[in-house]
């Protein structure tokens, strides 16, 4: 699939006359939106596409907030004391990420253009 991803990005970049990074960003955003639909709640999803290989990984992430602030968006936030249990060096306004299954590129990449 990674070769297909690169071919797709190159084709869209040439046809639409936009930079490859813009196309990669659109593909990442489309894949993230598709992945969000597979999860319950208003989760925060990030997709990272390797610009050289075309491989991509998908992450669910939580924003670290101060303990005293409480959770305003429970599906997207984690309290600092809970985050430190997983990552002792983490600070407020950083993110904890967990790898989740990636959706297949299929039509999603084409729709991103």
Where are these regions (language model features)?
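Charged, low-complexity terminal tails
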Residues: 1-112
